[in-house]
C-alpha cells in the first residue's frame, strides 16, 4: 500500500513537471512568433489655404465640419497655432523639413530640394522611412513633389476641376467679371454643375477637366447629378483603400506606417459639388468683422510693388490680396454681397474636405488602427476674408498666419482638450519624431541643418498647464516674389499669447495687443506707453535670426554699377512658359536636358551658302 501511494505521487510529480515544461516551451514559442512592432502609426492630413473656419476654432459661426470636430473631441486643439511663412511652397518646405526659412533660405517657390540646406536634411517622411516605417502619401504635401521621398505615392497634386474649352482652363462660367479676369485658379469659384450648353464668350463649348498640369481627364456630371471623382475625392478614395489594406494585414506582418494626405480645397478655384453650396444659402452668410479704414495704420502696402518683369495685371503681383479684394468688390453691387458669395464657396469647399476626413476617420475608428494611430490635421497657412481690404494669404496678420491644428495621439494626448500656447508648423516634425521615438540624425551630412522646431509632446499630455522647450512667440516670415533672400532684409511677425509684433523689411512696425484687440485693429507701435514692449520684441526678433544670410540655390554675380542679372532658373522658367510642350516627361517641371533637347529639335535648319 505504501509503495503504491509513492508510485502515484511520483507519477503525478513527473506529469506536473512535464506540463510546466511544455507550458514554458509554448510561451517561449509564442514570444518568438510575436513580432508585432509596438510603435505608433501616423496619419497626417493637410489642407491647402484652410484658415480657422472650422468648428471649435471660432473662425466662422456657420461652418459645418462635424468630422474635424469629431477628431478634435478625441485629441487636442491648438487654438494659437500659426504657420512660419503664409504661402504654400515655402510653408510646406518648412513644415516637412522642420527648418525655418531664415535657416534654409527657402522663402519662395524655387524647388525646395535645390536649396543646399534642405537637400542635405531629411524630410519628415524620409526620417520615418529611415526608422523602418512604411511611408505612403497622396495629393499635395510638399509643393514640389518628389516621389523618392515616399515608398508608395498615390496621386499628384491636382487643383481641378477646371472649366476647359478644349485648349485652356477657364474660370467658372458663373464667376462674374472683372474678378474672373484674374484667371482660372484664383479668379474662379462656383458649384460643380453640368456645363452642357455652356460656352466661353467666344463660343467655345466648355467641359470639366481634372488631371493637373500633366493630362486632360474629362470629369462628367451624370444625369443623376452625381459627378466623377474630384481630385480630393480621389485622394480620399486612395487613403481609404490603403488604410483598409493596412488594417487587414496582421499586425505582426505589418510595419508601422506614416501616411500623408494632402487635400487641395479650400485652395482656389473654389469649385465643389452643388450639394455643398446648398448647405450655405448665400443670403444667410455671416460676414467677418471688418473695420472701415483698418488698413490706414498698417504698413504692408509700403513694401508691396510689382516684381521685376511683371505686368500690373499679373497673377503674381506682390499686392495679390488687395487686387483680389478690389476685383471681387467691383464684380458685385456691394462689398457685403461680394464677400457673401466668396465665403459661401469657401465654406462649401471646407465642407467637401470634411467629408473626406470623415471617411478616413471611419476606417481608422472601426479597426484596430484606432488605438495605435496618431492623427494630425492642419493647414499650410490661413486666408484673409476682406479684413484690412485684403483677400488672400501671405500677410503677417492673424487671418493669414493662424491655422487649425488638431492632434489625436492615443496614450499621449488628452481627449477633448484645448491648448492656447503658441506653436507652429515647424514644431510638428520634432513632435511626431518624439511621439514615435524615432532615432538617428535628421541631417544627411554636415551641409544640412538640425531641426529648428521643438516637440510639444508635453503639451499633448498636459494641454492646460504643461511646459515645453519652445519659444514664447511664433516666428512668421513673409514671402516676396524675388530670386534671392537675405534673412535680415525680410519682413517678420512674432505672435505670443498677448502681442503680435510685425517688422517690415523697410523698418516699418505694427504692434497689436491681441488680448484686448483680437482683430488687430489698433496699431500701437508708435504710442510711447508701449515702447518697452516693442523694444523687447525687437530684441526677441533679432535673437531669432542668424548672424549671416543663406546662400541661395543659384548665387548671382553682379558687376558694380550694373543691374542685377536674372538667374538661369528665371530664363528656364520663361522658356517653359512659352514652350510648355518642352516638358517631355509631363511631370509639370522643365529640366535643363529637356530644354536643350527641345531647342535642338526646334532649331531652324542652317541655310547653305553654296
Residue ranges and their predicted role:
Residues 1-14:
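Bacterial N-terminal signal peptides that target proteins for export
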Residues 2, 17-504, 508-509, 518-539, ...:
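Formylglycine-dependent sulfatase
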Residues 511-512, 581-582, 590:
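Signature of WW domains and closely related Tyr/Trp-rich beta-sheet microdomains
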Residues 515, 519, 585:
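Adenine-nucleotide cofactor-binding loop residues
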Residues 531-557, 561-562:
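A contiguous, mid-protein "functional segment" used to position or interact
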Residues 572-585:
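Primarily EF-hand calcium-binding motifs
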Residues 585-595:
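Acidic Ca2+-chelating loop motifs
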Residues 600-601:
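Short, composition-biased linear "edge" segments at structural boundaries
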Amino acid at each position: 500500500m505504501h509503495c503504491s501511494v509513492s508510485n502515484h505521487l511520483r507519477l503525478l510529480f513527473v506529469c506536473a513537471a512535464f506540463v510546466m515544461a511544455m507550458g514554458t516551451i509554448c510561451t517561449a514559442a509564442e514570444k518568438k512568433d510575436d513580432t508585432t512592432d509596438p510603435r505608433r502609426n501616423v496619419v497626417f492630413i493637410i489642407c491647402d489655404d484652410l484658415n480657422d473656419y472650422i468648428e471649435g476654432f471660432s473662425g466662422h459661426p456657420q461652418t459645418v465640419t462635424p468630422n474635424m470636430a469629431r477628431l478634435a473631441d478625441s485629441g487636442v486643439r491648438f487654438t494659437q497655432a500659426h504657420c512660419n511663412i503664409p504661402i504654400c511652397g515655402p510653408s510646406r518646405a518648412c513644415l516637412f523639413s522642420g527648418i525655418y526659412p531664415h535657416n534654409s533660405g527657402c522663402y519662395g517657390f524655387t524647388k525646395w530640394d535645390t536649396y543646399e540646406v534642405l537637400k542635405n536634411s531629411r524630410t519628415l517622411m524620409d526620417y520615418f522611412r529611415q526608422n523602418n516605417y512604411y511611408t505612403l502619401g497622396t495629393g499635395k504635401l510638399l509643393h514640389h513633389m518628389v516621389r523618392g521621398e515616399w515608398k508608395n505615392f498615390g496621386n499628384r497634386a491636382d487643383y481641378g476641376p477646371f472649366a476647359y474649352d478644349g485648349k485652356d482652363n477657364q474660370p467658372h462660367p458663373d464667376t462674374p467679371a472683372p474678378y474672373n479676369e484674374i484667371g482660372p485658379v484664383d479668379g474662379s469659384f462656383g458649384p460643380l454643375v453640368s456645363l452642357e450648353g455652356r460656352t466661353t464668350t467666344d463660343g467655345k463649348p466648355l467641359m470639366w477637366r481634372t488631371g493637373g498640369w500633366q493630362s486632360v481627364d474629362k470629369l462628367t456630371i451624370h444625369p443623376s447629378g452625381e459627378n466623377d471623382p474630384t481630385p480630393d475625392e480621389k485622394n480620399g478614395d486612395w487613403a481609404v483603400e490603403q488604410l483598409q489594406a493596412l488594417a487587414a494585414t496582421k499586425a505582426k506582418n505589418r510595419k508601422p506606417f506614416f501616411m500623408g494626405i494632402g487635400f487641395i480645397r479650400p485652395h482656389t478655384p473654389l469649385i465643389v459639388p452643388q450639394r455643398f453650396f446648398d448647405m450655405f444659402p448665400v443670403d444667410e452668410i455671416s460676414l467677418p468683422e471688418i473695420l472701415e479704414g483698418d488698413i490706414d495704420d498698417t504698413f504692408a502696402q509700403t513694401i508691396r510693388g510689382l516684381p521685376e518683369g511683371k505686368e500690373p495685371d499679373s497673377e503674381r503681383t506682390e499686392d495679390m490680396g488687395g487686387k483680389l479684394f478690389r476685383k471681387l468688390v467691383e464684380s458685385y453691387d456691394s462689398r457685403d454681397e461680394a464677400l457673401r458669395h466668396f465665403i459661401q464657396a469657401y465654406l462649401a469647399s471646407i465642407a467637401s474636405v470634411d467629408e473626406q476626413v470623415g471617411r478616413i476617420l471611419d476606417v481608422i475608428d472601426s479597426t484596430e488602427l484606432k488605438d495605435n494611430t496618431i492623427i494630425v490635421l492642419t493647414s499650410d497657412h490661413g486666408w484673409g476674408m476682406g479684413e484690412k481690404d485684403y483677400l488672400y494669404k501671405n500677410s503677417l496678420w492673424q487671418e493669414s498666419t493662424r491655422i487649425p491644428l488638431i492632434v489625436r495621439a492615443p496614450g499621449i494626448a488628452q481627449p477633448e482638450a484645448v491648448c492656447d500656447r503658441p506653436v507652429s508648423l515647424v514644431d510638428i516634425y520634432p513632435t511626431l519624431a518624439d511621439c514615435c521615438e524615432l532615432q538617428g540624425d535628421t541631417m544627411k551630412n554636415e551641409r544640412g541643418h538640425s531641426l529648428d522646431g521643438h516637440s510639444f509632446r508635453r503639451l499633448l499630455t498636459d494641454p492646460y498647464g504643461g511646459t515645453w522647450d519652445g519659444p514664447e512667440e511664433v516666428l512668421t516670415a513673409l514671402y516676396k516674389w524675388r530670386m534671392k533672400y537675405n534673412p535680415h532684409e525680410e519682413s517678420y511677425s512674432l505672435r505670443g499669447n498677448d502681442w503680435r509684433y510685425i517688422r517690415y523689411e523697410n523698418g516699418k512696425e505694427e504692434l497689436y495687443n491681441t488680448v484686448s484687440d483680437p482683430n488687430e485693429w489698433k496699431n500701437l507701435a508708435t504710442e510711447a506707453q508701449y515702447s518697452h514692449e516693442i523694444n523687447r520684441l525687437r530684441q526677441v526678433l533679432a535673437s531669432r535670426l542668424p548672424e549671416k544670410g543663406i546662400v541661395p540655390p543659384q548665387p548671382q554675380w553682379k558687376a558694380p554699377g550694373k543691374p542685377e542679372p536674372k538667374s538661369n532658373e528665371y530664363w528656364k522658367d520663361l522658356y517653359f512658359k512659352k514652350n510648355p510642350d518642352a516638358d517631355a516627361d509631363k511631370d509639370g517641371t522643365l529640366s535643363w536636358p529637356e530644354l536643350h533637347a527641345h531647342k535642338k529639335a526646334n532649331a531652324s535648319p542652317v541655310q547653305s551658302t553654296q
